[in-house]
Structures are given as C-alpha cells and as structure tokens.
C-alpha cells in the first residue's frame, strides 16, 4: 500500500504535531518553516495521494469488469469484491464509478490548494479554501455510504480506505487553513 505512506505523511503535516516533523527540513525548504506553508505542503501531498489512489481504484474497477483479478482474496480485505461489485461500485444517482468521482474531486482539491499556496494573499483564496473545506466535508457523507456498502459485503477495500483517510486529512488541512485565513496568523512568517 504505497499510497498510504504519502497519505499519512500529508495528514501528519496538516496536524499541529507536523511542526516537529518538518523542523530538520525547514532550513532547506523555507516554506515548511511557516505553519501556513507546512499545511499547504501537507495538503498538496494528501491531494496527490488521494488522486493517485482514486485513479488506481478506477483502473481496478475497469480490470475487474473485464474479468481480471487484481487484489482478490478469501479474507475480509478484498478490494476486488468491493470495487468489482456492480451494484455498489457506482454512485446511485449518476451511475459514475466512485474511483472516477474521487479522482476528479482530488484533482479539483489539488487545484484549489496549489493555486492558493502560490497566491496566498489573492482575493479568491478565501473562496478556494472554503470550497475545499465544503467539498471534503461533503465527502464524509460519501465515505459513510461507502463504509455502509463495505459492511453489507463484509469486505474492506484497502484502496478505498486510503482514499477515505486522504479525505479526512484534506478536510483537516482545509479547515485549519480557513481558520488561519480568518485570523492574523495567515501572514505570520
């Protein structure tokens, strides 16, 4: 589960304890020396990992629908059983695969956070951060539905769980940046 490593690293960076993790690197990478820079970096890493794992689940669903096996097992951990389930692998409204929805969402989140990190004092940054927080908060309802599906199947998809963790980390990061943007801490160096 290579996707889990950058997801956890990103989550640690957006949390307050991330300050102690980046201290050795802050001289070489000056943007990590500030709270805002560290959270932005953690969010970028998280969104890249979330997009990558979502693209992977989309690929797996394509392979499974063609009759291939990717990660099937006889244990509770079987992403083929979860992702390959034709009834649960698509959203109930539009019929789009969850992996595609996740990939598109994480790419949009990546745009929101990356553009905001490059122009942190632009007028539109507040809107971008609030949209990111809203999108990731909405993701909690999607996660609840997908976990319900996994409980119904009595299987756990490792890739899906990694994407869920990435959403939680992204919400924490966007929420912290929104709060920071509303305070004087936004422009502290």
Where would I find each of the regions flagged by the language model?
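Membrane-interfacial helix-loop segments of redox and metal-homeostasis proteins
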Residues: 1-189
């Amino acid at each position: 589960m290579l996707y889990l490593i950058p997801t956890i690293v990103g989550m640690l960076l957006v949390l307050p304890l991330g300050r102690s993790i980046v201290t050795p690197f802050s001289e070489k990478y000056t943007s990590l020396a500030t709270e805002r820079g560290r959270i932005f970096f953690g969010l970028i890493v998280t969104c890249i990992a979330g997009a990558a794992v979502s693209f992977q689940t989309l690929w797996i669903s394509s392979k499974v629908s063609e009759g291939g096996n990717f990660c099937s097992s006889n244990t509770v951990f079987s992403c083929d059983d979860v992702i390959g389930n034709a009834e649960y692998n698509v959203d109930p409204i539009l019929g789009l695969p969850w992996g595609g929805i996740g990939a598109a969402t994480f790419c949009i989140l990546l745009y929101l956070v990356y553009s905001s990190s490059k122009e942190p004092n632009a007028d539109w940054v507040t809107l971008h951060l609030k949209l990111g927080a809203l999108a990731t908060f909405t993701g909690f309802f999607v996660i609840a539905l997908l976990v319900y599906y996994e409980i119904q199947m009595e299987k756990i998809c490792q890739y899906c769980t990694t994407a869920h963790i990435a959403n939680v980390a992204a919400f924490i990061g966007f929420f912290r940046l929104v709060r920071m943007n509303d305070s004087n801490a936004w422009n502290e160096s």
